[in-house]
UniProtKB/Swiss-Prot annotation:
Pathway per the UniProt entry: Amino-acid biosynthesis; L-lysine biosynthesis via DAP pathway; (S)-tetrahydrodipicolinate from L-aspartate: step 4/4
One annotated GO biological process: diaminopimelate biosynthetic process
Name of the coding gene: dapB
Gene Ontology CC terms, in alphabetical order: cytosol
Name of this protein: 4-hydroxy-tetrahydrodipicolinate reductase
Biological function: Catalyzes the conversion of 4-hydroxy-tetrahydrodipicolinate (HTPA) to tetrahydrodipicolinate.
Length: 269
């Protein structure tokens, strides 16, 4: 009988953390062993299962990842860039692999993550949903066929508490398109604003961003020509699809030694 992969979760009390824990508990191949919060958090020492409403599971909330180094195989992190980089230091020190779902990294921070991948195995993805990763492939193919004849726009919608914009997923969609078109996403993007904007530049990707209510996540890519329009849309109805993909990634990366991976590697796309 195969041993279960022991997983540590950072930010276990947040929306994503709760979903991850519930999915781990439902997965026969994984086992939650560590739940890490910020220093001096008021819930330290409490059973995380009781806190998130699934009953006691024997995992106490801690702010000391270093003393838990022998208790987990893979860390899953959906926090913020500064926190992720700190957890990466721990993982590198203790030779633990990590799954990163945090978004909003700067180029310099991405370079730091890449440097750590020479010593440990890292999966980083803007979106762990299987559906959104299939969307990336559809967008790539569509861009190859009609990209040069279309105005391309990305519309993304998220809940009012999301702190980064555009979303990491929207930016990744932009990168997929830019690679096919041989564009530079940083230079060849339009972020719509009021006023006289002039005629739309055909060789740019337009971004429209909505933050409202409790929208989990919706991304639409529009390919518009003079004669027709194609829309490709992915809508997440809840966060469980993200959690399942992250757990699948943790199981996949458990036995890897080093390297930087994403969901296309996990899904063999």
């Amino acid at each position: 009988m195969n041993k279960k992969t022991r997983i540590a979760i950072t930010g276990p009390i947040g929306r994503m953390g709760r979903m991850l824990i519930k999915e781990i508990q439902n997965n026969k191949q994984s086992h939650l062993t560590v739940a890490v919060v910020q220093k001096k958090h008021q819930l330290i020492g409490q059973d995380i299962g009781r806190i998130i409403g699934i009953g006691e599971i024997g995992v106490l909330i801690s702010d000391e990842l270093n003393i838990k180094k022998n208790d987990f195989d893979v860390l899953i992190d959906f926090t913020r860039p500064a926190g992720t980089l700190e957890y990466l230091k721990y993982c590198n020190k203790f030779k633990k692999n990590i799954v990163i779902g945090t978004t909003g990294f700067s180029k310099e921070e991405i370079d730091i993550i890449k440097s750590y991948s020479q010593k440990i195995a890292i999966i980083i993805a803007s979106n762990f949903s299987i559906g959104i990763n299939l969307l990336f492939q559809l967008i790539k193919k569509t861009t190859q066929i009609i990209g040069k004849d279309s105005d391309i726009n990305i519309l993304e919608y998220h809940h009012r508490n999301k702190i980064d914009a555009p979303s990491g997923t929207a930016l990744e969609i932009g990168e997929v398109i830019s690679k096919v078109m041989n564009w530079n996403l940083n230079q060849d993007s339009i972020y719509y604003q009021k006023g006289i904007t002039g005629i739309r530049d055909a060789k740019k990707i337009g971004f429209s961003i909505v933050r409202a209510g409790n929208i989990v996540g919706k991304h639409t890519v529009m390919f518009s020509s003079c004669d027709e329009e194609i829309k490709i849309t992915h809508t997440a109805s809840n966060r469980m699809s993200f959690a399942r993909g992250a757990i699948q990634s943790a199981l996949w990366i458990h036995k890897k030694n080093t390297g930087l991976f994403d969901m296309t590697d996990v899904l063999s796309l």
